[in-house]
Amino acid sequence: MKLRFAGATDIGRKRKQNQDRFLIQPEDNLFVVCDGMGGHLGGEVASQMAVDDMANFFIQTRTDDEITWPYRPDKRLSILENKLTVSIKWANWNIFHKAAEEVELNGMGTTSVAIAVDEKHLAIAHVGDSRCYRIRGGEITQLTTDHSLLEEYKKYSALSEEEIANFAYKNVITRSLGMKVTVLVDTQTHPKKTGDLYLLCCDGLYGELEDPQEILHTINEFRSNLDEAATELIARANRRGGRDNITVVLVELY
């Protein structure tokens, strides 16, 4: 089974900087989207550090089997889940300490959502409110749950659609890289299935295209060319307002 993939990012229509970053590392079947936050330049620094640290960890573990991991693997997780988790934790540690050392970077952080693929499985890891969707059999499914204040409220209260739409703190996240010296990473593993397509994206996309069916229809319309699909998703989010940076990565199994 092979992979097709594409990624794109855009500053949007309201922001002065693009604090998003994405990574496509075909040698390791590694795909990442990060949405940075904090300070004048902090968000850009944090998201760039995250993709760099994750990329380097996968490179080092690919080329050196004897390398000492910065965190002990969790026996309950698959090797792919462990590699994603440790790479994110390592990035978090570096971001946290850099923010503590440099005053102008205090408070910086980033989300991260990532996919890694091996011979039989596809693993997903995430921190924050950047998402992973899967398109299978003509249906789109959100596989990740946002680490946000809204999701915390939904655990304990039955909110109506109107209450969710008008929730005042919808964009407040409860986890990010750089927030604390350690970070809890959510992971999951799925068997590979021919025809599956995975979308990694930040809130700049789904905040404008709020109906997942619109995301599905856009991808299906341009599915023969994933670069065009990624470009069109961003264009439609910009036409809806482009209030934030917009980043997407598409990964299809065929």
What is the role of each PLM region?
Residues 1-254:
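PP2C/PPM-type serine/threonine phosphatase catalytic domain
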